[in-house]
Amino acid sequence: LGLGSFMATSAKAETTQEASFAAASALTDALQLALTLEYLEDEYYRLGINTSGLIPAADKVVFQQISKHETAHVVFLKAAISSLGETPIAKPNFDFTAGGNFQPFTDYQQFMTLAQAFEDTGVRAYKGQAGNVASNKAVLQAALQIHSVEARHASKVRRMRMNKGWVESNNGGNMPAATNAVYAGEENVTQAGYNTSTLFGAAAGSASFDEILTGQQASMIAGLFIS
């Protein structure tokens, strides 16, 4: 009985330790992904506001403020990763033309198109990683705070482009096909087993609930702009 009890206790301790390591790894991976996305947005807006003649004066103040937010997010995430005893990933080399498909720093409309795509990606990506940062309450709180700010960015940029401030179905609005991956899955109308389109219709049902992006999906989208 004593040996059996010891073995059971040891197995439980080992399982608990393995779960703890898994949670720590998931937390770090989530933060590194978030840092990659924030690096992307931070550099994008910095380049945009420093490109002479690109952004109209009336809009520039908006992007200057968004840029400040993204820089603050980068600083926080690097500090959070370091506090966990890990090394923050280095900032990648970005190609915001995505291999020549976009010219955001010579065409303001394209600049805003990618701004919307990046912000909508960020909103879904943070939501997708919530479970992976739940093991650390301080990080979870900060991640949720960043998530809500990213949602405000997305809504503002969408309205600047004459779109609704929210996403309906998998239609990003007046967006090119090259951004389809950002909105894939947003057409879902079933939440916790309930079909929200039953009472409200598919457009309202899908718009009422944002969908997540998995880490793999978010990394794939970001990877399109990493050289």
Predicted regions and their residues:
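All-alpha RGS (Regulator of G-protein Signaling) helical domain and cognate RGS-like helical scaffolds
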Residues: 2-227
